[in-house]
Regions:
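Disulfide-stabilized netrin-like
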Residues: 105-119
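Structural detector for short beta-strands of small beta-barrel domains
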Residues: 73-89
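Hydrophobic beta-strand positions in extracellular immunoglobulin-like domains
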Residues: 82, 103-105, 137
Length: 153
């Protein structure tokens, strides 16, 4: 049986950290060129800022992306329970959710929270709801809600 893993677009449209790390790769350069367009010259400080943000964003995004993919590919399915849900307004009609859940792995209780973008699965979650999680035995303190990351775009 082949394990299903979320696509690149599913990850950046669901996971708050992955999306922000991905934006960080390009944001410095966008700011740098927009400033040059309006000011008429290039600002050395913004060049340094962009040159620093790009590799940091690349490394952080690659780490988060690999963490999610490897958890889906090599992790084990475990039951978990949603313990808290916090809603954060990020714009007129957009919301992010901070979802807290707990689960048992190898006889030990773990709690994890994950900030995710507004998706239909996240909106439908309720406190106390049972969910299927994926956790890797090497990093048992991190688990992801399976259905949320595999939800169609």
């Amino acid at each position: 049986m082949q394990e299903i893993s979320p696509t690149f677009f599913q990850i950046i449209s669901t996971d708050y950290l992955a999306q922000n790390y991905f934006v960080m790769i390009f944001a410095g350069w966008v700011i740098y060129f927009i400033d040059a367009l309006f000011e008429g010259n290039f600002t050395f400080f913004l060049l340094i800022f962009a040159a620093i943000c790009t590799p940091i964003g690349l490394m952080a995004f690659f780490w988060r992306y690999r963490l999610i993919v490897s958890t889906f590919e090599n992790g084990i399915e475990i039951p978990g329970q949603v313990t808290e849900i916090h809603t954060l307004s990020t714009g007129k009609k957009r919301k992010d959710f901070i979802i807290h859940y707990q689960y048992h792995l190898n006889g030990q209780l773990f709690q994890y929270r994950n900030r995710v973008k507004q998706k239909s699965f996240a909106k439908a979650l309720r406190e106390g709801q049972q969910v299927i999680l994926l956790a890797h035995e090497k990093t048992p303190h991190i688990a992801f809600i399976k259905e949320m990351y595999l939800e169609a775009l």
